[in-house]
Design a protein with these regions (language model features):
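Conserved acidic residues
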Residues: 99, 119, 157, 249, ...
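Alpha-helical substrate-recognition element adjacent to the catalytic core
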Residues: 2-107, 153, 162-253
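Asp-based, Mg2+/Mn2+-dependent phosphohydrolase catalytic module
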Residues: 1-11, 126-159, 163-190, 202, ...
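Short acidic-hydrophobic, aromatic-tinged amphipathic segments that line or gate anion-handling sites
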Residues: 100-105, 123, 140-141, 251-255, ...
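Short hydrophobic/charged patches on amphipathic alpha-helices used for structural packing
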Residues: 110-111, 260
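Short, structured coil segments at secondary-structure junctions
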Residues: 94-97, 116-117, 135-136, 244-247, ...
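Short His-Asn-centered micro-motif
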Residues: 76-78, 122-125, 226-229, 272-275
Length: 298
């Protein structure tokens, strides 16, 4: 029987999202891939520093402490295979049990998400992220200069999500951008009992809820909805989650307030939002990734 990842939460991640390869990337952009490969080979025994998504990956892999594996992390990288050696060695140095990887030397690796049945793709490459989202894979462009995750919650995976165009469709956001706040509030008040259509990250939230149900005395998941919505538009968001039989732990209806300082207090391992302004504000405080979906991302 072939090995299968069925039933596991599968996270595909680029090497630059997992580890801090910013210095090496600057050399690549200034020269070529061969100079980059030489530098990575020279540093093959030097563990790379943790990157923006390191804490998220490290904590998710902790769900595998029991006999049955629940989480699989796969490197999906534009790096060359030689540079891939340093990625695997860095993972081993930090005790990350990562065994699988695909290295494509400059080619887009997103097409390998399908045979992996990936639940999430994290990359610093916007084109790859957009391709993944077009293929219905939850994906985000990691901001490599984001603040690193807090170490205050070692036994919790903390993930924060925007609502419209991330967990939910962009239906309401389109009304807001076309007709303004008053029309948006009226639209949502009139449809409070009608669930919103799913957004690109609903499948990930469902997968996280399934993972939370697995017996794990060491780890738990804590989720937050962090949205620019405010009352009365809050009700449709809550009722939509109820209709999906999904529970979240915290909800912040901020009515247009900047999200960054609220996220700083929540201390997530990662935050997902569809608007670059929100991500840039958040990235000063927490690890953040841009979801290039919906009307704000033509």
């Amino acid at each position: 029987m072939p090995v299968t990842l069925a039933g596991q939460l599968v996270v595909a991640i680029s090497s630059r999202a997992l580890f801090d390869f910013e210095e090496e990337n600057r050399l690549f952009e200034a020269t070529d891939d061969r100079a980059y490969m030489r530098l990575q080979l020279e540093r093959v025994d030097e563990p790379a520093k943790p990157g923006v998504a390191f804490s998220l990956v490290n904590k998710l892999l902790a769900f595998n402490a029991g006999e049955a594996p629940h989480v699989e992390v796969v490197i999906l990288s534009r790096n060359d295979p030689v540079s891939g050696m340093r990625v695997f060695r860095s993972a081993k140095h930090y005790g990350l049990p990562i065994q699988r990887g695909v290295f494509t030397r400059g080619e887009s690796p997103w097409r390998y998400l399908r045979p992996l049945s990936a639940n999430l793709f994290l990359s610093t490459n916007e084109a790859d992220v957009r391709s993944a989202l077009a293929a219905d894979v939850p994906a985000a462009r990691v901001y490599p200069h984001s603040a690193r995750a807090s170490s205050a919650h070692p036994n919790e995976v903390r993930i924060a999500f925007d609502g419209d165009a991330v967990l939910f469709s962009d239906e309401a956001e389109r009304v807001y951008q076309r007709a303004g706040l008053d029309a948006f509030q009226a639209h949502e008040r009139e449809r409070a009992a009608k669930p919103l259509a799913p957004g690109p990250f609903k499948p990930l939230l469902e997968a996280l809820q399934r993972l939370q149900m697995e017996p794990s005395p060491e780890m738990r998941i804590r989720t937050a909805l962090v949205t620019a919505r405010s009352a009365p538009a809050h009700e449709r968001a809550i009722r939509t989650l109820m209709d999906w039989h999904i529970e979240i732990d915290e909800a912040m209806f901020l009515g247009g307030l900047a999200k960054g300082e609220f996220l700083r207090e929540f201390e997530p391992d990662f935050f997902f939002d569809d608007q670059t302004g929100h991500i840039e504000n958040a990235a000063a405080h927490v690890p953040a990734g841009h979801v290039a979906s919906g009307v704000s991302n033509p």
